[in-house]
Amino acid sequence: MIKRTKKVMAALIVAIMMTTTSYTVFSAENDGWTEAPYTEAAQGGAWEAWCEKWETLKNDWTQLSITPGKNETELNFAWYSNKEETSPKVRISKNLDMSNSVEFIGEQSRAVTNKETNVEYVSNKVTISGLEENTTYYYTYGTNENWSEPVEINTQSTSNFTFFLAGDPQIGSSLKNTATGETEAIGQERSVRNDSFNWNNTIEKALSLVPNASFMISAGDQISIRDKKANMEQALAYTDNEIEYAGYLSPDALKSLPVATTIGNHDAISGNYSYHFNNPNTSTLGSTVAGGNYHYTYGNTLFIMLNTNNTNAQEHKQFIEQAIAEAGDVTWKVVTLHQDIYGSGEHSNEPEIVELRYKLVPIFEENDIDVVLTGHDHTYARSKILKGGVKDESTFLTGDEYEEFFDIEFESDYTELVEDEKYLNYLESIEDKNAIQSDLIVKGENIYNPEGILYITANSASGSKYYNNVPRQQAYIANRWQEDVPTFSAISVDNVSLSISTYRTDTMEKIDDTITIVKSVEYGNLLEKIEEAEAKLADKEKYTSSTWVAFEATLLSAKKIAEDTNLNEELVSEVYGNLKVAMDQLVLKGDTIELNVEITAAEELLNNSVVGNEAGQYPQEAKNELLVAINIAKEVCSSDDASQIIVDEAVSKLKEAVNRFKNTVVVKEEALGGITNNGSNGNGSTSNNSISTSKPNSGVNTGDSSNIFVYGILSLAAVGIVALNFKKKKEIVK
C-alpha cells in the first residue's frame, strides 16, 4: 500500500517556517477531479437547484438502498430508522394505489448513533420475492405501519438484459482539492456535495442511454473516509462517513435501480457498509469489518462479488466453488472485486496488487470465469484475453523497493523514467506476456469462444478522483483511457454473447470499441436473434434515425446470410454478434415536452422585450443571441436523431441563453446616477462575489464537450459554454 508523503511534509515544513496561517491553505495538490459547477450538467440552474436539494439530504442517514436478490425473482431493501421504530416492511403491488399488495416483513439490527443528535439508528433489511420479468411494480416501505409514498420499479428481461458497471464513486474523495478562485481545500461537506452531483449525473446519463437496465454493479469504494486505526468496537460504530453515504444514496434513480456494491478498501474497515446494504447469499468467507463475499444469479449469469481486502485466497476459492455449485447450470460467470489485478493505473504495478493477482487468477481460471470487473485505480483499462500468468519470484520486488523506484517517476510527473535493471525486470515480468492468448478467432469487435478471461478496470463514475495511467503500458492491456471525465459501462448479456460498451458522461461517446464475447452459436440461435430483431421493426419511430439505419442494415444482412442453412459455425457466430451489437446500440428518441415548454417561454420573453437604452429595455445583440438559441432548440425538437441526452442538453443551453438575456436588461441605478446593464457594478465590470453554491467564471474547463450532434446545432457561440478540466498533480493515497 503506497502513500505519497514527501511533498506533503515538505509543504508543511515550509508553511510552518513562513507563517502561522492554517495549514489547510497549503493543502497538498490532490488528484485530478471533476469540479461539478463547471460541467455541462450543472448549467441552466441545475447546480444551484442541487445545492438547495443537498441541504435537505446531507443529514439524512435513512435513505434507501436496493440490491439484487439471490436471483431475478427477488430484491433486497435496506434503510436506517430510529431504534424506537420497529417492524420493518415492504409492500409490493402492480397497482399505483397499492391495491392487492403483498407485504414482506424484515429484520432489524443495531447500526450507529448520530453523535450530534444522539439519535440511535437501527438497520432494516427486507427481501421481497415472487417478482416476474418485464413487469411494472410499485413498492412502499416503512416501520411502525408508517409507509413511504409508492415508487415505481420495473423488472426487465432475464434472457436478454443489460447492466451498468460503475467504478469508485468514492463520494467525498475530492475534499483535498481547492475550488476555482479559492485558496483552501473544500473539505468534506462540499466535496460530498460536488461528488454526489456528478454521481447523480452519471446515473441519469446511463439510464438515458439504457432506460431498461436491470441493475448496476459498483466496483467498490462507495465512500471515502474511514479510520484505519480504529479497533473493532470503534469501526462498528464509525459515522464520519455517513454524510458520504447520504450523498452516494441520494440519486432518485437508485430508488428503482438495484445496485450490487463491491467492498472497496475505503468501505472495508467500517461497519456501516453492512448496515446500508442488504446483500444476497452473504458469506463469512472473505470477511472484513464491512462483511464478506456474496453472490447472486440473474438469468443465465452468475455474479460473484469478492471482498479482496481480505487477501485469503483459500477463502475466496472455497466461496467461488460454493457459489458455482449453488448456481447450477449458467452460461456466464462474472467476478467483481475492487483491486485492479490487470489494470494500468498508478496502483496496478504495486507488488501487493500483483501478488493478489497471482493468488486469484489460477482460481478464476480453474472455475471457468468469463469476465472479471474491477475498480480501484480510477482510470479505464481493458485487458487482452488472458490465461496462465505466472509469478516470477526472481524478479519480484518488495513494496518498499518498488516505492523507491516509483517515487522518482511519480514526483517528476513521469518525465524522468527509471532505467534501473532491477525495476525494469520487475515491470517486464508482471506484464504476463505469456498469458496473452494469441490464437483467438476475432472478427471486428467480436471474440469467439476465447480460452481465457477478460479483465475490465472501471474509471471513476463520479469524478471525485482520477489517477494517471502508468507511463509504460503493460503488454496485457488491449486499451486504456484517462481524460479526467466520469465514465460508465453498459454490459449486455444473452444466451450466447456478452458485450461491453463504455461511455464518457460529457459527450456520451464511447471511449473504447464495443467488445463482444461470443460463445458457441448454433444456426437456431441466429434465427432466434433475427426473430427478436424483427419484433423491433414495429417500433421504428421510437429510435433515433442514425441508430435505426445501422440496425436495419445489419438485420437485412443477417437475414440474407441466414438464407443459407449450411452456414459454418464461425460465420453464424459472426452474424449473430454483429446483429446483437446493432440491437444493443439502438437509442431511443428524447422526450421533448420540457424543451417545448422552455421554447414557448423563451419566445414569449423575446417577443415582449423592447430594444433600446431605456430602463427595462434590451440590446439588439442580446435579442439576436436569444433568437439563435431558440432556433437551435427548435432544430433539436424537430430532429429524428435527438436522443434524450441531446434533448436534455438543449434544455440546459436554452435556459442558459435565457438567463444571459435577462442579465442584459437595462436598469437605472439611482445611486450611480446612470443607466447600466443588469449585473454591472456601474464601472463596466461585473461583480463576482463568490458564495459556496455559486459558479465562478464559466471559462473554466471540466472536460465537457458536446455530442457530435450537439456540436452541429448546439455549440454556437450564442449558447455554447467552453469548459475546461483542471487536472491536478496526483497524491496517491489508498
Where are the regions a protein language model picked out?
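Short acidic, glycine-rich surface-loop motifs adjacent to enzyme active sites
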Residues: 213, 219-226, 327-347
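Divalent metal-dependent phosphoesterase catalytic cores across multiple superfamilies
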Residues: 31-262, 268-289, 318-325, 353-367
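Beta-rich interaction/scaffold domains
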Residues: 521-701, 709-715, 719-729
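Active-site environment of divalent metal-dependent phosphoester hydrolases
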Residues: 171-175, 223-227, 263-271, 312-314, ...
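Extended active-site neighborhood of metal-dependent phosphoesterases/phosphodiesterases
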Residues: 122-128, 136-157, 178, 183-189, ...
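Sec-dependent signal peptide cleavage junction
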Residues: 19-33, 696-707, 726-731
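Bacterial N-terminal signal peptides
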Residues: 12-20
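Bacterial N-terminal signal peptides that target proteins for export
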Residues: 2-9
